[in-house]
Design a protein with these regions (language model features):
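Short beta->alpha linker loops
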Residues: 41, 71, 95, 131-132, ...
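ATP-dependent small-molecule kinase phosphotransfer cores
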Residues: 32-118
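NTP-dependent small-molecule kinase module
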Residues: 24-26, 134-197
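A glycine- and Lys/Arg-enriched "phosphate-lid" helix/loop adjacent to the NTP-binding pocket
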Residues: 94, 99-160
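Hydrophobic "anchor" residues on beta-strands that sit immediately upstream
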Residues: 5-8, 89, 126
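Hydrophobic residues at beta-strand termini and immediately following loops
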Residues: 37, 129, 173
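Walker A (P-loop) phosphate-binding motif
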Residues: 1-23
Length: 197
């Protein structure tokens, strides 16, 4: 059985982790081996540096921050490739499109951001859980990092995600609906596009 990589993208509080976990339960119950990932991975040295920057302990330009995010994903590249070779379904809470969305929102070239990630395994399906920026801010009032406090930035990030979602390997869903409704749409897409259910 081939492996698949499914990425969940969207603003913070859009339901990415919730939907990745729900799909993991469904696929596991159907007999598929799965692997849940979340980026950034704060358990690595690069992830620790990202956390410091997000909480204001370090100051980096937008280009350096995106390179840190990309490097954090490259830290996991060999494991991802191994899991895919084993036939696992990898479910990512954020993946390569996040760097493009947040970088483009900060006036970085999206082509450059895609190019530096070209050696990472490509997602077979990217699911955009789209919510308005004001909903994202309302859902997370406490402990927001520097990106989550900037409504204008979140609006630009959302625009980049929506442009990327024109790719046929993407599915855009409204993330402000009941969780069960979103989960049903995710399962239907995984069944029809990847034949997993």
């Amino acid at each position: 059985m081939p492996g698949f990589l499914i990425a969940f993208e969207g603003l913070d509080q859009s339901g990415k982790q919730t939907q990745a976990e729900a799909l993991n339960e469904t696929l596991t119950a159907a007999g598929r081996a799965c692997q849940l990932l979340s980026f950034p991975d704060y358990q690595t040295a690069i992830g620790t540096e990202i956390r410091r920057a997000l909480h204001g302990e370090r100051e980096y330009g937008a280009d350096v921050m995106q390179l840190l995010y990309v490097a954090n994903r490259y830290e996991t590249r060999k494991r991802i490739e191994g899991w895919l070779a084993e036939g696992r379904v990898i479910l990512c809470d954020r993946y390569t499109a996040s760097s493009i969305a947040y970088g483009e929102a900060q006036e970085l070239d999206p082509g450059w951001l895609a190019d530096v990630q070209r050696f990472l395994p490509a997602a077979d399906l990217t699911i955009l859980l789209d919510i308005p920026p004001d909903v994202a801010v309302q859902r997370k009032q406490a402990n927001r990092d520097r990106y989550e406090r900037d409504l204008d930035l979140l609006t630009r990030v959302r625009g980049s995600y929506q442009r990327q979602a024109a790719d046929p390997r993407w599915l855009q869903l409204r993330g402000d609906r009941p969780k069960a409704d979103v989960s049903a749409d995710v399962r239907a897409a995984v069944a029809s596009r990847l034949g997993l259910l």
